[in-house]
A protein has these predicted regions:
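Interfacial segments of alpha-helical transmembrane regions
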Residues: 45-65
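N-terminal signal-anchor/start-transfer transmembrane helix
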Residues: 38-45
Length: 188
């Protein structure tokens, strides 16, 4: 009877470890894909709206974020938590997180350009990406916070709110002997 319990516990522990390893790998791979989702959503939204300025703003913010991110990666050369003894010449630098930069750049673009209904889900995905990079032992919290700050900052610099076309009419108004004025009408 005791032998069966030992076997049962060993099987349970092995299954738990296999599940944990599988989950770890799933989180790692899912963050590789989802880090691009907010920016891809922003690009599709801008193209559907025929928002050329939005496409340009997203392109500029992403290019700036990438340039700053890789520049800091080359200067700082902080090793990843998964490989602390990696040589300093390695291209596997941790700070700042490129995944977090890309995710938060896209999320901030969506929030600022198209409002909270687009931004909140994008920020939820971005937070998952940041958490996932730490969970997968690719980065620590400083790395993902640095990447998030770079991405959000780049998007804040370039992105302006999207305004639908409005009709604005300005015309002089004459009120007889009482004087005149300006008549302004706007149609949304």
């Amino acid at each position: 009877m005791d032998f069966r319990r030992i076997i049962l516990w060993l099987v349970a522990i092995i299954c738990f470890q296999a599940t944990a390893f599988g989950q770890h790998k799933f989180v790692d791979r899912s963050t590789d894909v989802l880090c691009l989702a907010p920016a891809a959503t922003g690009l599709v939204k801008a193209l559907v709206e025929k928002d050329r300025k939005g496409v340009l703003q997203l392109t500029l913010s992403t290019a700036t974020g990438i340039a700053v991110n890789y520049g800091l990666n080359a200067c700082i050369k902080k090793n990843r938590p998964e490989m602390p003894n990696q040589p300093s010449w390695s291209d596997r630098h941790a700070f700042p997180s490129t995944h977090s930069m890309a995710a938060f750049d896209g999320a901030t673009f969506l929030m600022r350009r198209y409002g909270w209904k687009w931004g909140v889900p994008a920020y939820a995905v971005s937070c998952y990406v940041a958490w996932g990079r730490v969970h997968a032992n690719k980065h620590d919290w400083w790395d993902v916070l640095g990447g998030a700050a770079i991405g959000a900052g780049a998007a804040l610099i370039y992105t302006r709110p999207f305004a639908k076309k409005v009709d604005l009419t300005i015309s002089p108004a004459v009120f007889g002997e009482q004087g005149g004025g300006v008549h302004i009408a706007m149609q949304f």
